[in-house]
Amino acid sequence: MNLEDYNEKLKLLKKSVQDIKIRNRNLLKQEAEEKEKGLKPRVYSMHDDEDDSDEKRSSDEQSDMRTNLFQYTVQDFIDWEKRQQRKKKSKLESKSGMRLQHLAKNTYDKELQNLPRPEFKMKAKETQFRINKDSGKVNIKDNKELVQRLSQNLKETAKQRYDSNRKIANDKEHTSLSGSINAKNLQFNKSLDDDHEAEK
């Protein structure tokens, strides 16, 4: 086959594509007209099968879905894909380290709120600050007592959280390894194991 034959085939394919598009539009128009006609109240007999009405409903739903699908543009589809990717990304971030960062920030903010403000009010004259020549930012010296109290409170909170998590982990480990709920249950399980080994 030479180039002219391929060119002819391409023209035929393009023409068939256009014919199919026209046929699809006509079918959609017919379905829409039938649907409008179908909205009029109908008279049903008592002996009509419910299955027939279910089939009609499902065919109507399918035609509605088809017409809705033709109303979306490529740009709508691209936007929808981007939204789906953002949702997946946000789910992954919330499951991983973002949750811990959020917890750390909330803990820090709580500790700052818990610091007593009236004791450490500073007067404008006492405030010492410098302007950084490179960045142009203002550097203010923090009150050492406030910083130490904040660090002490954060350490206490972290220790409490660590102790509670360790206790929970130990409880889980103890019950899962031994398979017993309390000391009596543990003793009973050991006697059963001993009896079972003695029978062998």
Curated annotation (Swiss-Prot):
Regions of compositional bias (Polar residues) in chain numbering: 176-190
Coiled-coil features, chain-numbered ranges: 1-37
GO annotation, biological process: mRNA splicing, via spliceosome
Localization per record: Nucleus
Keyword Nucleus: yes
Region (Disordered): 25-67, 85-117, 157-200
Domain of life: Eukaryota
Main location class: nucleus
Basic and acidic residues compositional bias, start-end: 25-39, 54-64, 107-117, 157-175, 191-200
GO cellular component terms listed in the entry, alphabetical order: cytosol; Prp19 complex; U2-type catalytic step 1 spliceosome; U2-type catalytic step 2 spliceosome; U2-type post-mRNA release spliceosomal complex; U2-type prespliceosome
Keyword Iron-sulfur listed: no
Keywords: Coiled coil, mRNA processing, mRNA splicing, Nucleus, Spliceosome
Subunit structure comment from the entry: Associated with the spliceosome.
Family, per entry: Belongs to the SYF2 family.
Function in brief: Involved in pre-mRNA splicing.
Protein name: Pre-mRNA-splicing factor SYF2
Organism, as annotated: Candida glabrata (strain ATCC 2001 / BCRC 20586 / JCM 3761 / NBRC 0622 / NRRL Y-65 / CBS 138)
Gene name in the database record: SYF2
